Amino acid sequence: MRELRVAVLIIAVSLPSFSASDRQGDALYDMKQKLNVTGNQLSDWNQNQVNPCTWNSVICDNNNNVIQVTLAARGFAGVLSPRIGELKYLTVLSLAGNRISGGIPEQFGNLSSLTSLDLEDNLLVGEIPASLGQLSKLQLLILSDNNFNGSIPDSLAKISSLTDIRLAYNNLSGQIPGPLFQVARYNFSGNHLNCGTNFPHSCSTNMSYQSGSHSSKIGIVLGTVGGVIGLLIVAALFLFCKGRRKSHLREVFVDVAGEDDRRIAFGQLKRFAWRELQIATDNFSERNVLGQGGFGKVYKGVLPDGTKIAVKRLTDYESPGGEAAFLREVELISVAVHRNLLKLIGFCTTQTERLLVYPFMQNLSVAYRLRDFKPGEPVLNWPERKRVAIGTARGLEYLHEHCNPKIIHRDVKAANVLLDEDFEPVVGDFGLAKLVDVQKTSVTTQVRGTMGHIAPEYLSTGKSSERTDVFGYGIMLLELVTGQRAIDFSRLEEEDDVLLLDHVKKLQREGQLGSIVDRNLNQNYDDEEVEMMIQIALLCTQSSPEDRPSMSEVVRMLEGEGLAERWEEWQQVEVTRRQEYERMQRRFDWGEDSVYNQEAIELSGGR
C-alpha cells in the first residue's frame, strides 16, 4: 500500500510537467501551421508528440519548458500565431529573414521571460503593439526591415532591461520616446521620426548609435559625425546592386572606442568580435573544418543563441587599402541578395585576420552530394540536379547582369554551390570575387580558381569576364550529369581523357553519352533532359569566350528556349573546326615525316 501511495505521488508531481509540455507543443504546432511551413521543413513538429523538446530548432530547460525557438531564414511566408504568447518560459525567439506578413499579435506581451525578440527582415505590417512594453526582461528587440507604421509605443521606454533596440527601415512616424536614446545601442534609421531635443542632429541623418563603456557626449557627437561622413563617402563611391527591396542609404554603425572589440552592424551585416567567432568554432578546431578553398578554410560554428554558422577564415588576403578597402568590398558584396546566392551575414577584422560569416548549409555542397556522401545518405536525384542547374544559373545571372558593378565569381564549380535544407542551390564563395566595371574586364596577377574549371583565356592571360564564369558553369553541368570530377587521373587507366570536358566531347562524337551518366542515378533520369544538359554544357565551354552564351541565355535554354538553334549552329562550327584540325594534322604528319626523311638522307650521305 505504501508503494502505491508513492507511485501515485510521483504521477501527481509529473502530470503538471507533461501537461505544460503538451500545451507548449500545441502552441508551437499552431505556430507552424500559421507560418505555412511547406515541404520537409519542421517535419518533426508533430502534434501527436507530447514533448516538443525533441523538435528541431526548439531548446528546453531541465523542466521541459520551451526556452528558445530559432527559425531564422527559413523562407516562411505565413503569419505569427497569437498562441506564441502562451510560451511563458520562452527567452529567445528568432524569426528573422523570412517572408512573414501580418502584424505582431498583442499576445506577445505575455512572454514574460523573453529576453530576445528578432523579427528583422520580414514583411510585417501594422503598429508595434504597446503590449511589448510588458516584457520586463527584454534586452534585445530587432524589428528592422519590415513595414511597421504608426509611432513607437511609449511603453517600450519603460523596459529598463533593454540594451539593444533596432527599428530601422520601417514606416514609423512621430516622436522617439526620450528614454530610448539612453539604450546602449539603438537604430531608428530609414523612418519618418521626430527626434525632438534628444539627439544632437536632425532625424534626417543616420539615426544609429552604439555606446562605448566610457564614452562621453563628445564621443557621441564625433562618432555620429564620423558615421555620417563615412556613409556619404560610401554612397558617393559605389552604386548598389539593383533590385534591392529598399533603395535608401544603408545604416552604418561606428565602433566607439571601448575596452572590448564588440559587435557592430554594417548595414544588415553584423561585425563580430574575434572572441565570438573563436568561441563559436571551438578555437577554430580542425574537427569543425567544413572545407578548404582558394581563399582559406571554412569552419562550422554555433552562436550562443544556437544559430549555426560557417566562418571563412581568409588566408593570404591582401587589400591595398587595408581594412577600409576590405569593408567597402564586404559592403558591396552584402547587397548582392538573391535566393540562389549565399547571403553574407557578418564579418570580423583584426590587425592580422579577415573572416566572413555565412549561414550554415546543412546539406553541404553539391560536390559532397555527388561524390563524397557517406553510406546511407541520400544522393542527388535527377530532379534535384535540374534544380541545381537552373538555380545556379539564375544566381550567376544576377551577379553578372543585375549588380553594378557586376561581380565575377571566378571559381564556379559543384563544390562552391551549397544546398539549403530544401536542397535549393545557393552559390557561395563569391565573397571575394573581383568587382569589375560594366565596360571592363578584370585583370589579375594571380589566377583564382580550380584546375579543370578555369577557362583557357583566364589561365593564359589572367583576364576574367562573365564568360569565364560561363565556362566554369558548363563544367559544373558535366559534374551534375556524370558525378565525376573535372580532373581525374584515374581515367588514364582506361585510356580516357584526364579532363572531364575532353572525355565528354569524345563520347559525344562517338554517340556514347549514355555511358557517362552517373551510375548513382540508377537510370532514373530522362534521356532527352540529359542530352539537353550536355548540349548546354558544351556550348558554355567553347574555347572562345565570345562564342559562349551569357548566363541569361543559359537560363532561357534551360527553360526550353533557343537551345535547338544554338546547338545546330555549334555542330556546324564544330564539324568545320574538326575537319580543319584533321587537315592540319595530316599536313603536320606529312611534314614531320619529310623532315625525318631529309635528315636520314643527309646522314646517309658522304662525309
Swiss-Prot record:
The active site is at D411. Glycans are attached at N36, N110, N149, N171, N187, N206. PROSITE patterns: PROTEIN_KINASE_ATP (PS00107), PROTEIN_KINASE_DOM (PS50011), PROTEIN_KINASE_ST (PS00108). Residues 241-607 are cytoplasmic. GO terms for biological process: brassinosteroid mediated signaling pathway. Residues 284-563 form the Protein kinase domain. GO terms for molecular function: ATP binding; protein serine kinase activity; protein serine/threonine kinase activity. Its EC number is 2.7.11.1. It is found in: Cell membrane. Belongs to the protein kinase superfamily. Ser/Thr protein kinase family. This is LRR receptor kinase SERK2. It comes from Oryza sativa subsp. japonica.
